[in-house]
Curated annotation (Swiss-Prot):
Stored PANTHER family: ZINC METALLOPEPTIDASE EGY3, CHLOROPLASTIC-RELATED (PTHR31412:SF2), ZINC METALLOPROTEASE EGY1 (PTHR31412)
Top-level division of the source organism's lineage: Eukaryota
Official protein name in the record: Probable zinc metalloprotease EGY3, chloroplastic
A cellular component term, taken from the record's GO annotations: chloroplast membrane
Range of the transit peptide: 1-54
CDD domains (alphabetical): S2P-M50_like_2 (cd06160)
Basic and acidic residues compositional bias, start-end: 61-73
Bilayer topology: Multi-pass membrane protein
Organism per entry: Oryza sativa subsp. japonica (Rice)
EC number: 3.4.24.-
Region (Disordered): 13-32, 58-122
Top EC category: hydrolase
GO molecular function: metallopeptidase activity
Keywords associated with the record: Chloroplast, Coiled coil, Hydrolase, Membrane, Metalloprotease, Plastid, Protease, Transit peptide, Transmembrane, Transmembrane helix
């Protein structure tokens, strides 16, 4: 459907287009819902762009004509005579407007509009208009496009029956599209900012300035009471004044090192539409989640076979691998329950959980999308922390209990044997080898804790716990919409989180290029392109998090660094990036 494509394009291009417009006035824009900002918005079709130009030119002409009309009325008879003669000329040389409303346009004006359509890419008025697109304008422009196409079809002669049949089908499709656009036009309307100004006051949010943003606006001022008290009261007043439900965001913007508080107002119908477009809680979404879960269990099964002793039978495979599966399921299950309970406490809807398969570690964690607005920065912080902390605790509990039960000597009767190839060129896994011990010393001699020609024995549950710690740390990297990226956005803001995300992507890329790590390459590509971008802004980004959450963030950052940083006792036999002495050959 043509209308849905343009409306969707404007929804996801509003943030990037508004950045261009507001940067000229030295104001920082707010990219509301561009979840993956590394993806460019889809461009408008040329026919829609032409209509945008016409609408822009008509609006500019009306604005210029308004003061001229007032001066004509004040001028007296001479101005009236000039106006009359002007209309007389229009009556002789004019043609009916495309809308058929009786408004006349001269040939010069039509030629000018046609030239603007040809040169729309370089037209400054068009660029200013596109600086703040809205759904209401898109619907009107698509409706005009449908009307023009219908008139063109009516004027074309029926050269043959086949052409007439095709035109009839096209005419019917355009007529149905026009009806849908008329229904949508009654739903999506731009808010009247002049009416909304009176809703702000000393007892809620004192607004001193306002500017248009999409179909809503950004009110600049200062908050007079806590957000949890102001938001419901202000939403009710604005909804009554606007005649439609609205959604509010309380945020901060920096301009020349001056931080200002702003209240952003948007029609609720448009926000609900965008959340509906991007949600994954659909039959296809659940089917994809099941497919990824099956794939992940398959990669765990394949990866487990690499750690069996030589000559192992199928019974050995079952007895040795089942504990590893149980360990993975325990970590994933506990972290998923903790995440959904925390999200429910804040009233945040989550998408289905998507497992990330890996043929190296079996699983690289779980990813969720937010399918509703976040009420505040506390929710943005607590939800990912709940997943990370619960995964860490479960992994440590499994590893410690398994090491204690087998005496940390031979891995128990169902031991897995971790071969040295597992760690080769993988600095992110050095923590695992530092715990279970290396296979050989610096001279290549097999150490007592290893079995020559096989590997280092380890209990399956302990191995699952160690891998769970590493995978959780990978998800805590401050990149994109990983759990660590969400925490960084809550702690430091969107700008600092974007810088950290870029630095993390560069570091992972360096590990892949310099260190030759396949895991660095795979995780860097996944974090940058699949989970890249920024998370949805919280509705309350003014209320501070508090020192306790900053302390928790510091603790998680230290744990993440210690478990991922290359160490001499792990992957490498010497400090930092020394080459391993054992290269395989089992």
């Amino acid at each position: 459907m043509a209308s849905s494509s343009l409306v969707t394009s404007l929804l996801f291009s509003s943030s990037s287009s508004s950045n261009t417009a507001t940067s000229t006035s030295s104001r920082r824009s707010f990219s509301l819902f561009s979840k993956n900002q590394y993806c460019k918005p889809r461009p408008l079709r040329r026919s829609s762009s032409r209509l945008l130009v016409r609408c822009s030119l008509q609006q500019q002409q009306e604005e210029k004509a308004a003061p001229a009309a007032e001066s004509h009325h004040a001028g007296g008879g001479q101005d009236d005579a000039a106006t009359a003669s002007h209309h007389a000329v229009e009556g002789e040389n004019g043609v009916a407007d495309a809308d058929g409303g009786g408004v006349k346009k001269s040939k010069e004006e039509l030629e000018e509009e046609e030239q603007q359509e040809v040169d729309w890419r370089s037209d400054e008025e068009f660029k200013r208009f596109m600086g703040n697109p809205s759904i209401e304008a898109a619907i009107k422009l698509e409706k005009k496009r449908a009307d023009r196409k219908l008139r063109e079809l009516d004027r074309e002669p029926d050269a043959n029956p086949l052409a007439g049949l095709l035109r009839g089908l096209a005419r019917g499709q355009l007529a149905r599209e026009k009806e849908r656009l008329e229904l949508a036009e009654n739903t999506f309307k731009a808010l009247d900012l002049n009416k909304l100004k009176s809703c702000f006051g000393y007892d809620t949010f004192f607004a001193v300035d306002v500017r248009r943003f999409g179909d809503g606006g950004i009110f600049i001022g200062n908050l007079r009471k806590p957000v949890e008290e102001v938001r419901p009261k202000l939403e009710k007043k604005i909804a009554e004044a606007a005649g439609t439900d609205v959604t509010l965001w309380f945020m901060e913007e920096k301009n020349d090192d001056i931080t200002k508080q702003v209240c952003m107002v948007q029609p609720k119908a448009e926000i609900d539409l965008q959340l509906e477009i991007t949600k994954l809680s659909t039959p296809w979404g659940y089917l994809s989640a099941v497919a990824l879960a099956v794939t992940t269990f398959g990669t765990i099964a394949i990866m487990s076979g690499f750690f069996l002793k030589p000559g192992a039978t199928f019974d050995d495979y079952v007895s040795d691998v089942l504990p590893l599966f149980a360990g993975f399921l325990s970590i994933l299950g506990v972290s998923e329950i903790a995440t959904r309970l925390t999200a429910a406490r804040y009233g945040v809807k989550l998408s289905p959980s998507f497992l990330v398969p890996s043929n190296w570690t079996g699983c690289l964690g779980v990813m969720n999308n937010y399918e509703s607005l976040l009420p505040n920065k506390k929710a943005l912080f607590d939800i990912p922390v709940a997943r990370a902390a619960s995964a860490y605790l479960t992994s440590v509990a499994l590893a410690v209990s398994a090491f204690v039960s087998d005496g940390s000597l031979n891995g128990g009767k169902n031991a897995l044997f971790v071969r040295p190839e597992f760690f080769y060129n993988n600095p992110l896994l050095s923590f695992v080898q530092a715990v279970i011990g290396p296979y050989a010393d610096e001279l290549g001699n097999v150490l007592p804790n290893a079995v020559e020609g096989v590997g280092v024995p380890v209990d399956p549950l302990a191995f699952a716990g160690l891998l769970g710690i590493v995978v959780t740390s990978l998800n805590l990297l401050p990149c994109g919409r990983l759990e660590g990226g969400r925490i960084a956005q809550a702690l430091f803001g969107r700008g600092a989180a974007a810088v950290l995300s870029f630095a993390t992507s560069v570091a992972l890329g360096a590990g892949a290029i310099i260190g030759g790590s396949v895991l660095c390459l795979a995780w860097g590509l996944f974090a940058t392109f699949v989970r890249g971008g920024e998370e949805i802004p919280a509705q309350d980004e003014i209320t501070p998090l508090g020192s306790e959450r900053y302390a928790w963030g510091l603790v998680l950052a230290v744990v993440c660094l210690l478990t991922l940083f290359p160490n001499g006792g792990g992957t490498y036999s010497s400090d930092f990036l020394g080459a391993p002495f054992f290269r395989g050959g089992i």
